[in-house]
Amino acid sequence: MNFGATFWGPMISFALFVWFTMKFVWPPIQQALADRQKQIADGLAAGERGKEELDKAQAEVEAMLRDAREQASQIINQANKRQAEMIEEARAEARSEADRILASAREEIDQEIQRAREDLRKQVSTIAVQASSQILKREVDAKAHKDLIDELATQI
């Protein structure tokens, strides 16, 4: 067996195969691996960005909820405050109305008392005039005078 041809033939064939593979087959494989590696790295980076954005969005949502709760609390406090003011205004108005009604009633009572006193004075003066005229018509007698005064006193 001829060692030179047997050895160099496959060796040259193998060298040509390696050169052909390195020249035409290996660059697309390396490019595909690099592209895949880049895709994976981009995917991981996108996942990290997505996670960061999700965390940021959750923080914003929590802040918005906190603000909404604070606003709701402020609105409730303002409503309670306004309610208390309205109740106090209504009470004050009711008190002033009650005072006005009481003053009006007292004034009417005073007027009625004045009218009653005036009527009483008129009646007393009328009775006094009648009594004096009857006394003058009768004879001046102490007993008759006393009886007449007692009778007039019972009329009053």
UniProtKB/Swiss-Prot annotation:
Cellular component annotations (GO), alphabetically ordered: plasma membrane; proton-transporting ATP synthase complex
Main subcellular location: membrane
Transmembrane segments: 4-26
Listed SUPFAM superfamilies: F1F0 ATP synthase subunit B, membrane domain
Membrane topology of the entry: Single-pass membrane protein
Residue pairs linked by disulfide bridges in the UniProt entry: none
Stored InterPro entries: ATP_synth_B-like_membr_sf (IPR028987), ATP_synth_b/b'su_bac/chlpt (IPR002146), ATP_synth_F0_bsu_bac (IPR005864), ATP_synthase_B_chain (IPR050059)
CDD domains to which the protein is assigned, alphabetical: ATP-synt_Fo_b
A Pfam family recorded for this sequence: ATP-synt_B
GO molecular function: proton-transporting ATP synthase activity, rotational mechanism; proton-transporting ATPase activity, rotational mechanism
Claim: Cell membrane is one of the keywords in the record: yes
Keywords: ATP synthesis, Cell inner membrane, Cell membrane, CF(0), Hydrogen ion transport, Ion transport, Membrane, Transmembrane, Transmembrane helix, Transport
Annotated compartments: Cell inner membrane
Protein purpose: F(1)F(0) ATP synthase produces ATP from ADP in the presence of a proton or sodium gradient. F-type ATPases consist of two structural domains, F(1) containing the extramembraneous catalytic core and F(0) containing the membrane proton channel, linked together by a central stalk and a peripheral stalk. During catalysis, ATP synthesis in the catalytic domain of F(1) is coupled via a rotary mechanism of the central stalk subunits to proton translocation.
Subunit structure: F-type ATPases have 2 components, F(1) - the catalytic core - and F(0) - the membrane proton channel. F(1) has five subunits: alpha(3), beta(3), gamma(1), delta(1), epsilon(1). F(0) has three main subunits: a(1), b(2) and c(10-14). The alpha and beta chains form an alternating ring which encloses part of the gamma chain. F(1) is attached to F(0) by a central stalk formed by the gamma and epsilon chains, while a peripheral stalk is formed by the delta and b chains.
Family, as annotated: Belongs to the ATPase B chain family.
NCBIfam families: ATP_synt_b, PRK05759.1-2
Name of the featured protein: ATP synthase subunit b
Organism: Halorhodospira halophila (strain DSM 244 / SL1) (Ectothiorhodospira halophila (strain DSM 244 / SL1))
Gene of this entry: atpF
